[in-house]
Amino acid sequence: MDIKYKEIEAKLFELIDMLKTCFTQAELDEVIEFIEYNEYSLALDTVIDIIIEEDKRINNDILNIMIKLSSIMNLDSGNLNKKMIAYIL
């Protein structure tokens, strides 16, 4: 496994651990399933969708990991920040 993918997977599991305070186990399991199938972008997209659709509140540490992940995966971290800013505690 490429070092970049190991870093992404480690960050995703770090994110999962932090989300235990605001996500249900079923929501976490859905994200974990994508990670297990190496669908890292879908895992992050699912986290974003759950936060928005379920009106979840997240802290800055969670947002920072999400931004770091999007940056590592060459996604638009600026757009992510704009989407998530309304959900910060």
Could you tell me what each predicted segment is?
Residues 1-89:
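C-terminal-biased regions
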